Amino acid sequence: MKFNVACIQLTCTNKVEENLQSITDYANEAIKAGAEFILTPENSSLFSLDGKELLAKCEGYENNSFIQSMQKLSKSKKKWILIGGMPIKVSSSKLVNRSILINKSGEIVKTYDKMHMFDVVLSSTEQYQESEKYLPGQEIAIANLPWGKLGMSICYDLRFPKMYRKMAKLGCIFLSVPSAFTKTTGEKHWHTLLQARAIENFSYVFAPAQTGTHFNKRQTFGHSLIISPDGVILAEKKSGTGFILAEIDGSLPDILRKKIPSLHLD
């Protein structure tokens, strides 16, 4: 079955309403262009590295106003939407980074909490300790789309190939990798890692991304990608905000897996 996927690329701020408006505008444009499934990047609702700001501005999961707005958008347009990642407050001092899949009726059908925390030292001036603010998720998430199974992940998960192998072996033919990759690591690894995950699992990869220089001077890499199961880049947005669109053939992963039956030989 063929369908159209859109990945939205954003330069999010620390203002939730501002980010929501950007997503709504680009989602509407993507839908007019034929998108049936729309994905947003990591940190879609709020972009901040400040733990106090995150805890002050983030809501819990229940009755979350940002999520409810996205549900209304999905229901009104009758389209599937993946909130790629957003901070959810789970205690007075901790959050989770949650990806939320919404069906065309506006119902939440699956959530995934980012499992691998981005705790890295890239240089003396660029360091990240995600675990100081966030709790890691404990299990993978697989969702049933109308076109096949989706394996959900977020950003730094991309560097852990066994996670994707497991999801592919459980029947996933689509992999979502919403991200806010740093410019530093993105320039070196982004394309290679995403194409590797697509090729080794014969799965489509949908990777919406944050881009540019944000209000807090953090730089994200952009280059949102839609990649075929044989590693071909079907669509890419190198920089700037907006969206990319590609037609997806849900029968292709199985065709490739039969030609090269490597998926179940390890």
Where are these regions (language model features)?
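Extreme N-terminal starter segment of soluble prokaryotic enzymes
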Residues: 1-6
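Active-site catalytic loop in hydrolytic enzyme cores
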Residues: 90-170, 183-185, 192, 255-265
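Short, acidic/polar
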Residues: 18-27, 159-165
